[in-house]
C-alpha cells in the first residue's frame, strides 16, 4: 500500500545558487519550481534560505510569498568559510536532534563543503536529497546524497497525458488537472504502483484544500471512475484491498479493463 509520508526540512544555500545562475542570460532562479517538486516527496515542515539578502532584494518578495524563512547572513567582509554555509549546517544538525519527526533533509546547494553534513545526517538515519545546478554542483556532494536533483531537470517531461475537455464545468476540470499533475509527479518519482490513496495524498500535498466533495464527488473513487470515463486515466482494482490502482493515461479497450 502507500508508503508513509516523509517530513522534509528544506535548507537553501542561496549564495551558492546565485553563483550558479550568474552569467546565464534570461534565466532567473524560481524557488517555486523547487517547492512544487519537493511536495511530491512529502510534507515540507521547515523552509529556510540563507544569504546576505541585502544583495538579493529582487528575490525577497517571492521567497516571502512562498513562506520561506529568510536567514540574514551579513558578509561584513568575511573571508574564508562562507558564513551562510556554517549557519545552514548548524541549523541542519539542530533540526536533526531536536525535531526527530523530520526524516528527510533537502540541501539546495552544489557546494562540496556540505558533504560532511550530509554524512552526519545519514549517520543519524536521515534521508538526504541534494539539489543544484548541473554545471556548478560538486560530484563529491552529488555522490554522497541519497539522491540528487538537478534544477534544470525540474520540468523534465514524463510523457504526454490526455487533454481535458474544455467544455467541462470548471470544478471538474480543476479536479481532473490536479489528478493528472499528481499522477505525472508519481510517475516521475518512479512509483511502480499508483494506489488511489497515494494519488489522493499527492493531490493534497499539491493543494492542501483539495476535497473531492467540493468538486462534486461523493468519494475519491467516484472521481477516479469519472476520470476514466472521460478517457484521462486507466484503472484496475487490487484484488486484496479492493481499491483502485491507476495503471496509465488514456483509454483502453473494454477487454481486460480492471482485471
PLM region descriptions:
Residues 100:
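Basic nucleic-acid-binding interfaces
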Residues 137-156:
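Contiguous mid-protein beta-loop-alpha structural module that forms a pocket-lining wall or clamp
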Residues 131, 161-259:
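N-terminal regulatory modules in eukaryotic regulatory proteins
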Residues 1-97, 117-122, 127:
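Domain-level signal for Mg2+-assisted phosphodiester chemistry and nucleotide/NA-binding surfaces
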Residues 56-60, 133-141:
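Short, glycine/polar-rich helix-capping loops at beta-to-alpha or helix-loop-helix junctions
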